[in-house]
Amino acid sequence: MRALLLAFQLLSVVAALTTVNCRLDLSPRQISRKDLLRTHLRLYQVGNFSGQPYSAKATLRDPEGRFRFEDLPVSHDENSTVYFQLVASSQDYNLKPNRVLIEVQGRGEGKEPTVRAFQNVFGREHFPSPEILYPEQLVELEAEPELVISYVHAAPMRNYIVSRRSGILDSGPLAGIFRSKYKMAAVVTIIALLLFPMLVEKFDPATVEAIKEQRLSQTREKYAAVGESNS
């Protein structure tokens, strides 16, 4: 008798399991082996539940990008609803949607549960119902025959190694001068004015002597004029 009861309970548990089929669409690109390794997919149970919550990870099964989450613990009782959160991420692409609320609703014994999907938003991962309107209503997605996840664009390059000490040309006053074309022009002008007399003296000493003589004569004339006015 106990064996029959145990077998009946086991069949009830098996009957209360379902599968969610999904697909990653990177068209027009083909999914490569690198995409298989650098794409992460996770599904976990949210909302009211008893016992251990469901949590599973999936990998891409084929070059078409198909993946699935199997043995989801759901109830076949009519009007019973179980919620799961699907999180998709990639090291190379920004995926859309990257958060999906999965709703599995029982339809009674002998009938497959109804699977619905809603595009979730950041900060609402643990809200167990799409009917919560704050801050916005969730957009329903096509879940049959499979939920499709695509990509927006390539993700920005990530700096896995960041130098703690940057050089003087990367930060500080000198970096500010090199980044601004106006400051750079002012510095070049000042340096040119400082170097001009030395360059002229080196390449044209006769002109330099003439300039010095002219300055000396102007100084003598100035002092001579001052002496005559005092006398």
Curated annotation (Swiss-Prot):
Topology within the bilayer: Single-pass type I membrane protein
GO biological process, one term: protein transport
Residues glycosylated per entry: 48, 79
Signal peptide start-end: 1-16
This protein's UniProt keywords: Endoplasmic reticulum, Glycoprotein, Membrane, Protein transport, Signal, Transmembrane, Transmembrane helix, Transport
Transmembrane segments: 184-200
Cytoplasmic side: 201-231
Lumenal face residues: 17-183
GO cellular component terms attached to this protein's record: endoplasmic reticulum membrane
Keyword check for Protein biosynthesis: no
Superkingdom as given in the UniProt entry: Eukaryota
Pfam family, one: SOP4
Compartments, as annotated in UniProt: Endoplasmic reticulum membrane
Major localization class: endoplasmic reticulum
tRNA-binding is among the record's keywords: no
Similarity comment text for this entry: Belongs to the SOP4 family.
Task performed by this protein: Involved in the export of PMA1, possibly through the monitoring or assisting of PMA1 folding and acquisition of competence to enter vesicles.
The protein, known as: Protein SOP4
Native organism: Eremothecium gossypii (strain ATCC 10895 / CBS 109.51 / FGSC 9923 / NRRL Y-1056)
